[in-house]
Every structure is written in structure tokens, then in C-alpha cells.
């Protein structure tokens, strides 16, 4: 008897918020990568940019999102899409969980390098 390969994966975005910023890859498929960014209150991701378009969604908490010399308040379930090469930054106003959607050819390592620089 031949069994069918599992065609789906259920992913929990619930994260324990630790001190600072922690990232993990949640989903990778033929189209995109989904990254979870857990940010403790007052943690900051300095100015950076992506080589492809991205989408950012706040799943929990609130983020002061800086882009194009503006500060935008993103609250739970708010999202924003950016074109490639737009410089942006994130400040967690409270413990927050952020969903980052990357183009399939972007890399998880690039996101990690933002935290290390």
C-alpha cells in the first residue's frame, strides 16, 4: 500500500518573548519564506533594506515602524508592504511578534545579519 505524502504543515506563530530580538524561519515553499521576529519591549532593528519586496505584519504587540522619514504605528494585525531597497527600521513599543514575508530568493541569513551588524 502506498501512502500519500503529507501536503500541509500547521505552524504556530506563538512565541515566548525573550530579551532582545529573536528570529526563526517558520515556512519556506516555492514562492516565499515566512520569518517570525520576536521583539521584547524597546528592542530596535536599525536601518536596513531588503533586495526584494517584503511584507511585514504585526501578529502581537505594537511596532514603531520607520520608513521614508516617517514613523508609522503598526498595531496587532496591521501590515505594511515595502518595495525592494526601501530603508526601514523597527522599534518594539511592547513585547511583539512580527511576521516577515520574504521573496523565495531572499535569504534568512540576510535577516540574521541585520541583527548582528
Question: Where do the language-model regions lie?
Answer:
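A cytosolic small-molecule/anion-sensing beta-strand core signal
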Residues: 59-60, 75-76, 94
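Short acidic-glycine-tyrosine-enriched beta hairpin
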Residues: 69-84
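Ligand-binding loop in jelly-roll beta-barrel domains
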Residues: 84-108
Amino acid at each position: 500500500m502506498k501512502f500519500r505524502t503529507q501536503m500541509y504543515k500547521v505552524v504556530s506563530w506563538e512565541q515566548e518573548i525573550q530579551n532582545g530580538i529573536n528570529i526563526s524561519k517558520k515556512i519556506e515553499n516555492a514562492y516565499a519564506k515566512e520569518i517570525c521576529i520576536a521583539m521584547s519591549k524597546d528592542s530596535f532593528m536599525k536601518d536596513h533594506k531588503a533586495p526584494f519586496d517584503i511584507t511585514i505584519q504585526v501578529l502581537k504587540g505594537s511596532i514603531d515602524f520607520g520608513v521614508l522619514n516617517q514613523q508609522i504605528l503598526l498595531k496587532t494585525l496591521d501590515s505594511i508592504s515595502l518595495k525592494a531597497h526601501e530603508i526601514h527600521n523597527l522599534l518594539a513599543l511592547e513585547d511583539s511578534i512580527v511576521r516577515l514575508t520574504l521573496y523565495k530568493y531572499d535569504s534568512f541569513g540576510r535577516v540574521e545579519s541585520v541583527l548582528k551588524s
